[in-house]
Amino acid sequence: MADRCWIVIPAAGSGSRFGSEVPKQYHLLKNKMVIDRTLSVFLNWEPTYKVVVALSPDDDRFEQTALGSHKDVIRVMGGAERADSVRKALEYVCEYALPSDKVMVHDAARPLLQAQDLDRLWGVRALTSAIFARPIADTLKRSQDGTIQETVSRDNLWGAQTPQMANPNALLRALQTCCDKGISVTDEASALEALGERVSIVEGPAYNIKITRADDLLIASALLEMLE
């Protein structure tokens, strides 16, 4: 049997920084919803077994998506924070996962990934947990009250992306332990790091942007034209 990959997509957030009553994943990107573009790349990628989407309890939009009723898409109730949503989705995954299975956790609002990108991350699955990330290019400043306090060296600094890949049981244990100990985690890798797990970096594509603010849709649209 070929190795299987579960996909977890936390989509319970309100997207307050986007500045719209409609969560960012439900906005249109060139005539398709952002989340449909995100789902599509995974549903058409051969190693994908199932896609588990964590939704807000009051989400009434997902059922209107083109791919929300796909036979390989499973809905679970999300939590208040991203880590809570991922943990709830992983509880489902771990109930059915095989020992050799992996999981990739991916932002609903990163719709531009290509199958060949997933292949590169999948290629290191036997060795380690791994994430996509990009080297920091901008000069970094630490500020207080709108004033620069210091310039921070960007040596060895990377900006984390998704997907982030791990063994589903190991990731669930890491997230649960961090929750129990009150350790704040901002992505899956930080939970694994907190437990001393080794997480490798695979350089992600520059176009793997996260739609966070309204003008990101314009950037994503331009990038999509390039990719098509």
Map each language-model feature to its residues.
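Acidic helix N-cap motif at the loop->helix transition within catalytic regions
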Residues: D60-A66
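Short aromatic-hydrophobic micro-motifs that form the base-stacking/packing surface
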Residues: K102-H106
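Hydrophobic helical membrane-anchoring modules
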Residues: N208-E228
